[in-house]
Amino acid sequence: MYRLISKYQADKILQMLKEELKEAEGALEGKVDWKPLPEKKESKVYAVDGSQGKARLSGTIIYTVASFAFGNGKSARLVYTNAMTYNHGISDQIIRLQMETLENKLGALVGNEEHMILMDGTLTGSLTRPPVYPESVKGITTLLDTLEKGKPEELIRDFVERLDEHYLDLEKRLAEERELYSGVILADEVIDEYSEFYKAMEGRDIVNYDGALKRLRDALKAEIPRSEIMKIAEELDEYTELKTLTLEEARNTIHVVLGYLEYLYSLEKLLQRELIYIAKSFYNRKITSKLGINLLDVPFIDAYLVKTHGKELPGYCVIYDPERAEEKKKIAHRLPRILRKYFPTVQRFIEIGVPSAYIRTMEGGIIYLLQSNTSINDELIAKLLWHESNGYIRPLQRAHEGVKIEQKAFRAELEALMNYLKKKDKELRVFIKYGRSPLE
């Protein structure tokens, strides 16, 4: 067995870390408002997590996405299995979008007003990096450019009204069954009912400005003279791409937009609940950037606590509260203007930012990033701590264990599905052979 790390490399890493520690120690005069943890307060929660499994076959992806809720009450589950023709650009993003949509739906519907909802990850991530966002915005722009005036609004309004009914149906079925395996993703079910829109788009010319905008952005970043920028702007036509929409492209555009609308609707509904997002993997510099040091927040906090208290104390530190901050930390994401009135809560958090804090629940334990849709204070922390044990938030652990799609189980079900399809029609073998990458 050959060695992966030489002594030279180990010493180099050692030196780098020592330099970072020295830099942190030099800035430790900067105060970290590390508050002691409050006493635990009894509360009810549901924790929600999601999972996905997918198999890339010859030209087809067969996939399953699921969400699972565990907490003070009966657990609940949403599962969706589907197949799509592989599109290198966005297939994986669509699958992730549907998984996150199921997580949001379950979080919005499970339990009652007494339950806090615990989500894995960050709310800023849901707001800033929704999967297929560039394709979704491009799709909405295409709708506005190719449909008659008023038609894009008609499509959006109609689908949102369908989602209203869809949620009432989901809520009723969840109360009765607790595990739903059909009728959980609306966009895929109703896409063909919007054929009048994508047929009207067929044959229309659209202009792709991606290349032109990149050239203009690069010029602006380079801070070249205004006269040069104007010259580039006059020549931008050379970097645009004109194309005529096929029926399939028009249908795919509508489909992506519907999926994005369903995701935004699920997030809007989720934001009506009392939420806590918990992330254990993050690379923030919220505190250190203010102090002008090139170090992540977590090691800096640990260095500060060891220097001032002699140990890695449990406690928490609020790093952003939009109710108190003079300057709002807007989310680096914008809803297309046509959508803002349909998702006002999503739009509000994009504009004001997300309440955030760091927390450690036991001495020497992990520092988590907390985010919420309400101010983070002793009251909220006390209710969260009711569900903490040995540094971990147990309901989230159980939700993660309950939703995980095991490789062996997915392989078995995939094999059964492929055998069923081949039995029904032997010619389908061309789509379902050469399987690879069964689980992610």
Which residues does each PLM region occupy?
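Long, contiguous domain-sized segments
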Residues: 1-43, 95-440
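Short hydrophobic beta-strand that contains or immediately precedes a catalytic carboxylate
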Residues: 45-48
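Acidic, metal-ligating active-site segments
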Residues: 50-92
